[in-house]
């Protein structure tokens, strides 16, 4: 399918390309995935600034939506991907493939970082549904925070950045910018 982006989509793609730490807060159905994939395509296959991208998403979105979006759009032809869901053996096999984009469900972030035995050598991380990282006490948050300094580029995607109020924002932004905007410690933010 031919991609004819709206102005806001072009703006968001350009923002991701120009800012190594970015977030796209758009309602469902407004094209967060294609916006991000367009930027990934450019970073991986045009400017060669990124070699490996990790997309973290809810299980169904990781298994179905991201692969469908990559296959759907003509301008993304050539962008290779692997979906790392399922059993441990299936996830490892998917993560060992030589592709540009690795898609994993958020429940397996801790496994990937701490237990998989694979190096965390992703240049770019995309967190689809950033609000699922709102708890600073969650294992997935802590695991991702450990490897965050190794990541050159990160993008957070969500339609509901503060689903339960402003306290939810701290952990989401801590993972994105390592505490630059809202501080490194939750007690100070409170």
What is the meaning of each model-derived region?
Residues 28-29, 151-167, 174:
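Conserved helicase ATPase motor motifs in RecA-like P-loop NTPase domains
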Residues 20, 139, 158, 167-168:
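Short, functionally important structural connectors and interaction interfaces within domains
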Residues 93, 123-127, 159-169:
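Short charge-dense sequence patches
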Residues 1-26, 30-140, 146-150, 181-190:
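SF2 helicase/translocase NTPase motor core
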Residues 37, 69, 165-176:
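PAPS/PAP-binding and catalytic site of the sulfotransferase fold
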């Amino acid at each position: 399918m031919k991609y004819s982006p709206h102005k806001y989509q072009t703006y968001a793609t350009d923002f991701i390309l120009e800012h190594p730490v970015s977030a796209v807060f758009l309602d469902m159905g407004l094209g967060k995935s294609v916006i991000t994939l367009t930027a990934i395509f450019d970073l991986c296959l045009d400017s060669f600034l990124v070699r490996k991208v990790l997309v973290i998403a809810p299980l169904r979105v990781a298994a179905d939506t991201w692969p469908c979006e990559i296959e759907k759009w003509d301008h993304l032809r050539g962008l290779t991907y692997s979906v790392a869901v399922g059993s441990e053996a299936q996830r490892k096999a998917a993560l060992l493939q030589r592709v540009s984009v690795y898609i994993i469900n958020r429940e397996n972030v801790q496994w990937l970082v701490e237990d998989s035995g694979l190096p965390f050598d992703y240049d770019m991380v995309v967190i689809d549904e950033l609000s699922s990282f709102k708890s600073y006490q969650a294992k997935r948050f802590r695991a991702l925070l450990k490897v965050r300094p190794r990541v050159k580029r990160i993008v957070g995607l969500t339609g509901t950045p503060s689903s339960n109020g402003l306290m939810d924002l701290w952990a989401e932004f801590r993972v994105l910018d390592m505490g630059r905007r809202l501080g490194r410690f939750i007690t100070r933010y409170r």
